[in-house]
């Protein structure tokens, strides 16, 4: 397929939109292909009754990377939202992350995590980690990759801020506007409802691909394992449902992992998100991924690492025989569990060709 473009970007999420903008600002003509009907990837939102509803679960921007912070602020301003997460266990509410506040609430005495004995640590693990992790990943926590458990935050302070990063917030005009502005450039053409298949079309320009790497090669070596999510969203006819943006339900007997209440992401309540009518809540249900589902979290195992290596070798073979390189990235293309700022950073670091 001949094109009049200097590059094609497949996927209009964080990584793809950032790549497209960088290419456009160097003077290249860029075609962005997005298989969904709208841009924004899993940050896509919809305004319902004056509330910015995150369609694919809560997305909070936070970073300590000054380059990333400077880049995103070219396209939007952020509010001063600081993320806090509550946990519900046996009909009581606790403040995450694990720190002095939660220990005081759970044990009824002043403690630091470093002062816990084995019995206390086991009780804490069973209450707040075991059930939630089992639901999220579909296996006991002992079988989860250690890097996942390492993401859990532990503090020797009373702070209940979930993130430590100095820069945090939600775009004042919403995530959709951030992505619209990223792609608002005369050198960028966007086609939604249009994916990219390597085996179906050959392009005479570089391709930057952020879809699933196994799908790119028609699952030649088999499917990489993912966890998927299902969301149930409802309007509740009262001003506040749970008093927080996110409440984790840590017991395995509760089928969902958490409830999101999106009105709390805009405490400034001005502009498009002023005076919401009632509130919107979403329950999040993890599930095993199968073809046709949305892939969310890569499952890191020795087997998946070996399978990923086979697909990466296919990319290398393709590039060795093609004058137009294929560059993969993003959560799906790299098969990595990225925070949003890390996906921006990865896209900013890609050498452009």
Language-model features: where?
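Active-site/ligand-binding neighborhood in enzyme catalytic cores
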Residues: 87-206, 210-217
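Glycine-rich FAD pyrophosphate-binding loop
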Residues: 24-49
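Dinucleotide-binding Rossmann-like beta1-alpha1 core, especially the glycine-rich loop
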Residues: 49-116
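Short FAD-binding loop at a beta-strand-to-alpha-helix junction that anchors the flavin cofactor
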Residues: 319-336, 343-346
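Short loop/edge segments at beta-strand edges and connector loops
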Residues: 11, 82, 190-194
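An active-site-proximal "capping" alpha-helix that borders the catalytic cofactor pocket
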Residues: 341-353
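N-terminal Rossmann-like FAD-binding beta1-loop-alpha1 element of flavoenzymes
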Residues: 5-32, 351
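Mid-domain catalytic core of redox enzymes
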Residues: 194, 198-321
């Amino acid at each position: 397929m001949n094109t009049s473009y200097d590059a094609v970007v497949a996927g209009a999420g964080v990584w793809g939109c950032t790549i497209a903008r960088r290419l456009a600002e160097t003077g290249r003509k860029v075609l962005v292909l997005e298989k969904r009907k709208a841009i924004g990837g899993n940050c896509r939102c919809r305004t319902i009754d004056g509330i910015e509803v995150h369609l694919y679960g809560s997305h909070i921007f936070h970073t300590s990377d000054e380059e990333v912070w400077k880049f995103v602020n070219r396209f939007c301003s952020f509010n001063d939202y600081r993320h806090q997460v509550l946990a519900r266990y046996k009909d009581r509410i606790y403040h995450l992350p694990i720190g002095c506040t939660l220990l005081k609430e759970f044990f009824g005495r002043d403690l630091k995590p470093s002062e816990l004995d084995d019995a206390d640590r086991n009780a804490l693990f069973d209450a707040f980690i075991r059930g939630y992790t089992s639901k999220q990943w579909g296996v006991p926590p002992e079988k989860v990759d250690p890097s996942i458990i390492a993401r859990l935050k532990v503090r020797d302070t009373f702070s209940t801020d979930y993130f430590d990063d100095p820069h945090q917030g939600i775009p004042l005009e919403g995530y959709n506007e951030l992505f619209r502005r990223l792609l608002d450039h005369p050198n960028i053409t966007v086609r939604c409802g249009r994916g990219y298949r390597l085996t179906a079309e050959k392009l005479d320009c570089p391709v930057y691909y952020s879809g699933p790497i196994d799908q790119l090669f028609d699952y030649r070596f088999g499917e990489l394992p993912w966890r998927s999510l299902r969301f149930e969203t409802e309007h509740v006819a009262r001003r506040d449902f749970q008093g927080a943006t996110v409440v984790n339900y840590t017991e395995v007997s509760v089928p969902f992992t958490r409830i999101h209440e999106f009105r709390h992401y805009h405490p400034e309540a001005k502009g498009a998100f002023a005076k919401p009518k009632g509130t919107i809540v979403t329950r999040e249900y993890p599930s095993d991924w199968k073809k046709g589902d949305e892939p969310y979290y890569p499952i890191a195992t020795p087997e998946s690492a070996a399978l990923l290596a086979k697909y990466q070798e296919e990319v290398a073979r393709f590039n060795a025989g093609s004058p137009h390189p294929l560059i993969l990235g993003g959560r799906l293309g790299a098969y990595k569990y990225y925070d949003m700022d890390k996906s921006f950073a990865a896209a900013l670091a890609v050498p452009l060709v």
